[in-house]
């Protein structure tokens, strides 16, 4: 039973049901210091009803309450403070973790409901830069968290493969491009063309118009325009898939903006039939004044569609195809207004399922405080950064454990894991500066630090070479270090739920850091392998810790090496 539930039931019985179990659970607090107990109930809530001071009420409850399952229950001023029975709690938690293994913390909250997750979405014909990392790893982690809670996540890569920029790129290719040069080094050469043509289009309106015309041809199904565009797309996907392989990220569907190019007319017609489209300076808009939003521009004066038109078609397609219970968009915070408009247009059109669409924004990655910009050519390729991280990890592993057999494989797990973990430990709405030195460090709040704690436990268990009987676990919790681990293990299922509720993988990452820190304190304080009556209990405790550390890392898409 959950510790809050245990306390709430005992309290409700002690006060003769004046407050229900759920009401009590909602106001239970954690004392600031563990010396004051594990949980505390503020008696202020009962003062008015019982017509007594909170201090007197707390004292009466402490005397009356059934202390089964608790070491002690005491009144501290206006609070009733509960100290859990450490030994019983430890045995129960450890037994549960060892019995359930990687499934500890699983739940069926989602009951198999579909959750499409729009994530990653790099632009074709451009490098896969560090700027694309966040959407990719946050989306992947949320998918794993939701799957653990019984949902059916559907990871969709909504590639940026449609729009006027491709008309401009075709213009550049026709003017300056060479097929053989591009084939030899596709992304770099296409980037050069993209930067060159953007600079020209800013200075020369005729170049900009030519790009617009090529995109219009794409939308109208022009054979030459689509052939060149398809070639750009194919060479880009080869590069992207190689990088996804290094990241260990897979997708259920690659559905770029182009996939919806033949589905937009239906949504525009629907808006027209519902009298939602209004003409403004030759363009078609939806008025969103009642939502305190600017009008949504649905079609330009030349008939070309826009980003929001494609997203309207996308949303309708996903509802029809997946009948989602939630539809998540892991897209940067700068798109917040766009998603407000998108949901408002769908709401106006009578699609109440738009309430189940959630924009999951995130902060920006910078380098040296500067934003990455493909248009200006300021790009740091993610693949190069990952390779550098692996090299740095290998050097550190070489220094720590020169005889490690599978050094290269472990270096990949540590280097790539370090980059992913650093991103995911950052609160989603905050940005961060990309710093490999900090990421790949084995000290501090990093992925390698957590991985090393897991590997150290595995090393101890191999050295012990002893099978622990799950049915006969008895751990005397005589030190604060062991109790901190037990409390952390007990909290893991709630941590997973909280991460899901907030679409926040950093909750898992920070938990993994604190659990690794708790183990390292225990390791420094206790002789784990001492051959005494408590040996099996200690081995069971660290084995359970290893299981939960590994599962926390898995939910972040990070490997847990057995050796480091």
Swiss-Prot record:
Monomer. This is Arginine--tRNA ligase. Pfam families: Arg_tRNA_synt_N (PF03485), DALR_1 (PF05746), tRNA-synt_1d (PF00750). It is found in: Cytoplasm. A motif ('HIGH' region) lies at residues 122-132. Its EC number is 6.1.1.19. The keyword Protein biosynthesis applies. Belongs to the class-I aminoacyl-tRNA synthetase family. It catalyses: tRNA(Arg) + L-arginine + ATP = L-arginyl-tRNA(Arg) + AMP + diphosphate. HAMAP family: Arg_tRNA_synth (MF_00123). Its main location: cytoplasm. Keywords: Aminoacyl-tRNA synthetase, ATP-binding, Cytoplasm, Ligase, Nucleotide-binding, Protein biosynthesis. One of its GO terms (cellular component) is cytoplasm. One of its GO terms (biological process) is arginyl-tRNA aminoacylation. The lineage of its organism: Bacteria, Bacillati, Bacillota, Bacilli, Lactobacillales. GO terms for molecular function: arginine-tRNA ligase activity; ATP binding.
